[in-house]
């Protein structure tokens, strides 16, 4: 859902829609029409809800229903690491410590002592705030960069 997030800078607020411009609700409505399969193309969805395509694309990755967020169970993170023994294992241990369930690990061959790893895991049973877990992983030794790639 959210591509290329810089979670360390992102801030999330829960706001009553009555104080927001209608455009945000319309973006959500367009997303829901597409997700439900009622409308197949974005052009049609934005026409039905009354917003422009550019408005839709501007906000689609930043506006969510609370119910949409609470249903997120799987996340994909991309981690760039210094290639050192035990680094990936420590990251996996950290996720497991807070009751994250590892689903897949995709690791590229290290080049110039740098490795890229994508980790998909279930966060439905996490006993720590998700952003806090990402901050802890990001602060670990040999972690160069961490990006949130997707939530589902």
From Swiss-Prot:
HAMAP family: UPF0735
Disulphide-bridged cysteine pairs: none
Family the UniProt entry places it in: Belongs to the UPF0735 family.
Protein name, per record: UPF0735 ACT domain-containing protein CTC_00116
NCBIfam families per record: PRK04435.1
Recorded superkingdom: Bacteria
InterPro entries documented for this protein: ACT-like_dom_sf, ACT_dom, UPF0735_ACT_dom-cont
ACT domain segment(s): 76-151
């Amino acid at each position: 859902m959210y591509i290329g997030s810089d979670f360390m800078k992102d801030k999330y607020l829960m706001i009553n829609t009555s104080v927001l411009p209608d455009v945000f609700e319309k973006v959500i409505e367009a997303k829901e029409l597409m997700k439900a399969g009622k409308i197949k193309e974005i052009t049609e969805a934005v026409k039905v809800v009354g917003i422009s395509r550019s408005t839709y694309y501007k906000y689609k990755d930043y506006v969510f229903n609370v119910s949409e967020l609470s249903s997120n169970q799987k996340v994909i993170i991309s981690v760039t690491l210094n290639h050192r023994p035990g680094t990936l294992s420590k990251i996996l241990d950290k996720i497991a410590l807070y009751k994250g369930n590892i689903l897949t690990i995709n690791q590229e061959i290290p080049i110039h002592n740098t490795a890229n790893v994508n980790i998909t895991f279930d966060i439905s049973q996490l006993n720590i705030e998700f952003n806090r877990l990402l901050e802890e992983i990001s602060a670990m030794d040999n972690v160069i960069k961490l990006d949130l790639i997707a939530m589902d």
